[in-house]
Amino acid sequence: MSAIENFDAHTPMMQQYLKLKAQHPEILLFYRMGDFYELFYDDAKRASQLLDISLTKRGASAGEPIPMAGIPYHAVENYLAKLVNQGESVAICEQIGDPATSKGPVERKVVRIVTPGTISDEALLQERQDNLLAAIWQDSKGFGYATLDISSGRFRLSEPADRETMAAELQRTNPAELLYAEDFAEMSLIEGRRGLRRRPLWEFEIDTARQQLNLQFGTRDLVGFGVENAPRGLCAAGCLLQYAKDTQRTTLPHIRSITMEREQDSIIMDAATRRNLEITQNLAGGAENTLASVLDCTVTPMGSRMLKRWLHMPVRDTRVLLERQQTIGALQDFTAELQPVLRQVGDLERILARLALRTARPRDLARMRHAFQQLPELRALLENVDSAPVQALREKMGEFAELRDLLERAIIDTPPVLVRDGGVIAPGYNEELDEWRALADGATDYLERLEVRERERTGLDTLKVGFNAVHGYYIQISRGQSHLAPINYMRRQTLKNAERYIIPELKEYEDKVLTSKGKALALEKQLYEELFDLLLPHLEALQQSASALAELDVLVNLAERAYTLNYTCPTFIDKPGIRITEGRHPVVEQVLNEPFIANPLNLSPQRRMLIITGPNMGGKSTYMRQTALIALMAYIGSYVPAQKVEIGPIDRIFTRVGAADDLASGRSTFMVEMTETANILHNATEYSLVLMDEIGRGTSTYDGLSLAWACAENLANKIKALTLFATHYFELTQLPEKMEGVANVHLDALEHGDTIAFMHSVQDGAASKSYGLAVAALAGVPKEVIKRARQKLRELESISPNAAATQVDGTQMSLLSVQEETSPAVEALENLDPDSLTPRQALEWIYRLKSLV
């Protein structure tokens, strides 16, 4: 029989627990018991495994021992962080009644629910990384997707048209928690993600969503936000907002608007492209040697998060980009002065979110005060910068002198962690609080005077006055003198070597002091809450200030990076094309122990595809990736690693660079490669930048060559995309002779005997050879194997190309031949009976077959 089924047999306390647990059946319940949060039954068993804490038993209820695990209340944030990182959610149940006046169990209620996507506590968040709650919806027309960063109030929605676009959005946003409808069809799209939450269908209803959003924003409709005609996105947004309200158990005043993200506003990059370019995460899953690791020297966490958003959403509006470029140029002479001051601002964005949720701690308000104290100096420095965008940021960040003065008067210089610890409100801020504190703090002087007086009166030199939390104030006399205690001394506690007493005067003073301490703490909590009421009316202006400070941090950082790393300002042109003089890979040049070899690039409508040949390890992939990264950097407004760059409009960046088996989906390397290739061929346009590396590996030589040829042909002739096409199929170097707009380039290398020197220099024309055996020798392949390979190579080169292909590929089954149409000549031969032909008919058939070939 379960605990719920046997409800009436439980103790009153366990009945209270079971009622609360029934309201939150799928998540852990932290049930406050004095100085501990305790978990019972299955929750206790799960928590003991997840947190590696002891599983014990707490007496019995309904005749059965109760499995129990517990954690100290003062260490709860550490344990919550561990659970949230594992995708768990936790309901926090606090005592809200007074134990002294309660009959039966103290009243308790769930005051907040901590989930991976709705955390705002500083201890639970990665400070330089967005923490998103997301919701996904699907109908016959496509997907709806919404994200909310509850730690900043940033609310976005979009309507991805297909599965590939939706997958790219999931990878870009990487939500900590994802809500989906109970009938969601594309489960393979989200399976394996952390923080999945299945929600009932009614939470995604469009009418409910509109009502929820209008209520949140205080509007009659959503036209002003530009989302009125995005029903799928609104369905996701409505579910997401309801979930956020349910978990926070309070209003969300910092969520003031919602923004529609449209494909045409930014350069689109699919999941494979983001992965291959290693923008914020390398191929091994870490953050080292990524584009962000080179560009991100921001001095505030909110600036770092903004920069990463820019990197994942390059904008196409050249007006925005030119404004950023101009600002970066104007700030280059001021970075050394601005960055130390900006560093002192801290993470104002997340502090404001905690203020809005009324969970800001005393040190949050102290940090907010410190941020306000930097604003006058920042504004004074920016006044000297000759840039309209900088002056606009200066105005937007404001000064908040009144709020700074309020916090300077209200909060002590170094407050404790929690308001319940007391001593947060500064002396002089409130007269009544000062009076209660004086009464409580005067206890030390009183006790010293009492001790001197009683020693003199009794003549007992071992007499002393003290206090402990259990027994309160006492007079202590050694065991040897205890028989001399006056008659008015009432025994309170017996120790091994002493007796402790109380007298009416001391008891009366104890009551007075404890009352004053309690009243002081209660008043302090009230004054602290009133500070929220004084600050919250300024929330919108404060959020604008935080946004301006974060943007300033990003732009100052990019100015510093441009100067330090010798970057140049790219020029935007109207027609498709990319012209780079002495371009460099932004990441590789930082990790090399030798100078990076800069290379040029020229793509235009008249030269829209480069066939790139050269040895493995020669630098083909680096050359291709650096082109994409330079384009990406240009389209966030950054300066770029080159001597000169001219770049035209780009709508998408595609990369088909390297692949690995997708074992989880049952897809081979070749299948992954072909899926990514298909996506490119279906979605690329003449404004797209396409990187194709070694297409056609993983199948027979002829199949691979045929596929690579056809893909290159399609990209150059039909799609007309700007394409870098690296290959080891030397037959493809004939394409420039057969098609307009195609050119050969190669990565140079020098071979001397058994050694090879990679020049990493891009030259016009095709490579003379692939240097495969030299690279194999460099990799440590045994010499006898290299020797045998050279012998076999000479054999293959001495026979006809067809024979060579037969020897190499004879045992391989051609994928393309399976569905090839039979030629007319073959069909004619299959229907021919040679035994029935006359010599003349046989001759006629020879001529007929020749005409069919």
From Swiss-Prot:
Gene3D superfamilies: 1.10.1420.10, 6.10.140.430, DNA repair protein MutS, domain I, MutS, connector domain, P-loop containing nucleotide triphosphate hydrolases
InterPro entries in the cross-refs: DNA_mismatch_repair_MutS, DNA_mismatch_repair_MutS-lik_N, DNA_mismatch_repair_MutS/MSH, DNA_mismatch_repair_MutS_C, DNA_mismatch_repair_MutS_clamp, DNA_mismatch_repair_MutS_core, DNA_mismatch_repair_MutS_N, DNA_mismatch_repair_MutS_sf
Family, as annotated: Belongs to the DNA mismatch repair MutS family.
Any one biological process term the GO annotation gives: mismatch repair
Coiled-coil intervals: none
Gene Ontology annotations for the cellular component aspect, listed alphabetically: cytosol
Name assigned to this protein: DNA mismatch repair protein MutS
Swiss-Prot/TrEMBL keywords: ATP-binding, DNA damage, DNA repair, DNA-binding, Nucleotide-binding
GO molecular function, a single term: ATP binding
Keyword flag Cell membrane: no
Biological role stated in the UniProt entry: This protein is involved in the repair of mismatches in DNA. It is possible that it carries out the mismatch recognition step. This protein has a weak ATPase activity.
PROSITE patterns attached to this UniProt entry: DNA_MISMATCH_REPAIR_2 (PS00486)
Binding site residues for ATP: G614, P615, N616, M617, G618, G619, K620, S621
SUPFAM superfamilies per the UniProt record, alphabetical: DNA repair protein MutS, domain I, DNA repair protein MutS, domain II, DNA repair protein MutS, domain III, P-loop containing nucleoside triphosphate hydrolases
Record Pfam families: MutS_I, MutS_II, MutS_III, MutS_IV, MutS_V
NCBIfam families per UniProt: mutS1, PRK05399.1
ATP-binding found in the keyword field: yes
PANTHER family per UniProt: DNA MISMATCH REPAIR PROTEIN MSH1, MITOCHONDRIAL, DNA MISMATCH REPAIR PROTEIN MUTS FAMILY MEMBER
